């Protein structure tokens, strides 16, 4: 697969991931954790476990909610979650915390090549750059869904 086509497929996978995120909004987060995840307060070293737990709650929310075991999420989905929920001031930290995931095509083909934080960060930036209309007001949209479901 050519480099351009591969990047296009990855981006389209990330777009599909954002649509899944918007449709489900099943998060295993308290209001405090959601505020922590989306706030402009810079995460420090002691926040690492909470930050990972919050990002993972967005990635695996539906599975956790119904009690199914987790399976590794692809980079495209993790990048979409980070782009959608994490405040820009903490995106680099979120990518560092979540490094080690695999791109979808590697999972499908059985190739092990975990991404480093820098690659996840670059891909997350690409997702944000291509989805400004989707990401605009995303936080408020999610808050409204959570309120409607009685979570907040």
UniProtKB/Swiss-Prot annotation:
Its main location: host cell. Keywords: Host cytoplasm, Viral capsid assembly, Viral release from host cell. It is found in: Host cytoplasm. Changing residue 61 to E: Confers a lethal phenotype. Belongs to the microvirus D protein family. Assembles the procapsid by joining twelve 12S pre-assembly complex into a T=1 icosahedral particle, called 108S procapsid. Ten proteins D bind each 12S complex, which are formed by three pentamers of F, G, B protein and a H protein. The scaffolding protein is released from the provirion after genome packaging to form the mature virion. Component of the procapsid particle composed of 60 copies of the internally located B, 240 copies of the external scaffolding protein D, 60 copies of each of the viral structural proteins F and G, and 12 copies of protein H. This is External scaffolding protein D. It comes from Enterobacteria phage phiX174.
């Amino acid at each position: 697969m050519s480099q351009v086509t591969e990047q296009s497929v990855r981006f389209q996978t990330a777009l599909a991931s954002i649509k899944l995120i918007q449709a489900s909004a099943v998060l295993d987060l308290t209001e405090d954790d959601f505020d922590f995840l989306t706030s402009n307060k810079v995460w420090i070293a002691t926040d690492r476990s909470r930050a990972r737990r919050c990002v993972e709650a967005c990635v695996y929310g539906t599975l956790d909610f119904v009690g199914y075991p987790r399976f590794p999420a692809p980079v495209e989905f993790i990048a979409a979650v980070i782009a959608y929920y994490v405040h820009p001031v903490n995106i680099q930290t979120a990518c560092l915390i979540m490094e080690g995931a695999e791109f979808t095509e590697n999972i499908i083909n059985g190739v092990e090549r975990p991404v480093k934080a820098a690659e996840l960060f670059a891909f997350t930036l690409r997702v944000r750059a291509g989805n400004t209309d989707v990401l605009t007001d995303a936080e408020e949209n999610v808050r409204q869904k959570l309120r409607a479901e009685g979570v907040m």
